[in-house]
Design a protein with these regions (language model features):
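Short, Lys/Arg-rich, polar N-terminal cytosolic tail immediately upstream
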Residues: 1-13
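Membrane-interface interhelical loops and short amphipathic "cap" helices
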Residues: 36-52, 104-121, 178-192
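Alpha-helical transmembrane segments in multipass membrane proteins, preferentially the mid-helix core
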Residues: 68-74, 133-142, 204-222
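Membrane-interface helix-loop-helix junctions at boundaries between adjacent transmembrane segments
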Residues: 72-132
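Central hydrophobic cores of alpha-helical transmembrane segments
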Residues: 86-94, 226-236
Length: 237
């Protein structure tokens, strides 16, 4: 049984999602402005190497992700057709960022001190925002009808894509096997928690999402487009 949403419900969802995206952008700006690259008022309990990575992440958040969130949220409230393409680019990133920063940037070692735990609800909001917008944005894309891809071109794309994904996976798996054999790489010694958070997220979520996107191009091309955007939105950011 197909249920038709009322105009009031549709309007409510548009405004709610738009405000969630805008608030997510504001939170990212707050975290970035107070992070180690700018004001340095947030102290993460992690290694110097990880702090250097956070500085780069702060710049990305300020000049790429936050503008995407603002533009996507505002354009969705204003009922612009481009909004769905902007909304679907950021959900995976928001969840990934919230989890890696919330969990991975604190290591219970006396060598590191900080106060990042005070930002728990900031990171939680970003994770929930990513989950909600991912589920919502997928519904914005309707099946495109009969889509045909040139089999030769699709095969070339699939091979290149899968090889790239497998090479990326092998890099993480190699380090996982090193840890399993008690031959710890430098990245593990600096922050074991962050090491596992990133590998679990990549090997358990983003890499399978990429492989699934290729599979859908072959089996369900009419509905594969939003999954492509989910993956490439994360890959781009």
């Amino acid at each position: 049984m197909k249920t038709q949403l009322s105009d009031r419900t549709v309007t409510f969802e548009k405004v709610a999602i738009g405000l969630i995206l805008i608030l997510s952008g504001l939170i990212l700006i707050y975290l970035s402005a107070n992070g180690p690259f700018f004001l340095n008022t947030i102290k993460y309990k992690t290694s110097f190497s990880a702090i250097s990575q956070i500085k780069g992440q702060d710049l990305i958040n300020l000049f790429l992700i936050a503008p995407l969130l603002f533009t996507g949220g505002l354009s969705h409230i204003l009922n612009k057709s481009i909004s769905k393409y902007l909304i679907i680019l950021t959900p995976v990133y928001l969840m990934y960022y919230g989890l890696s920063m919330g969990i991975g940037m604190e290591w219970g070692s006396e060598n590191y001190s900080g106060d990042s735990e005070k930002l728990t609800f900031h990171f939680l909001f970003l994770i929930i925002s990513g989950l909600v917008t991912m589920m919502y944005s997928y519904s914005l894309f309707k099946p495109a009808g009969n889509i045909y891809f040139n089999k030769k071109h699709l095969m070339i794309y699939s091979i290149i894509f899968v090889v790239f994904i497998l090479l990326f996976s092998s890099m993480w798996l190699k380090e996982v096997f090193l840890v399993m054999s008690s031959n710890y790489p430098v990245s593990y010694g600096q922050n074991p928690v962050l090491f596992w958070v990133i590998r679990y997220l990549d090997l358990g979520f983003t890499i399978p999402l990429g492989l699934l996107s290729v599979y859908l191009l072959w089996t369900r091309p009419d509905s594969a487009f939003p999954v492509q955007l989910l993956f490439y939105g994360f890959f781009m950011t």
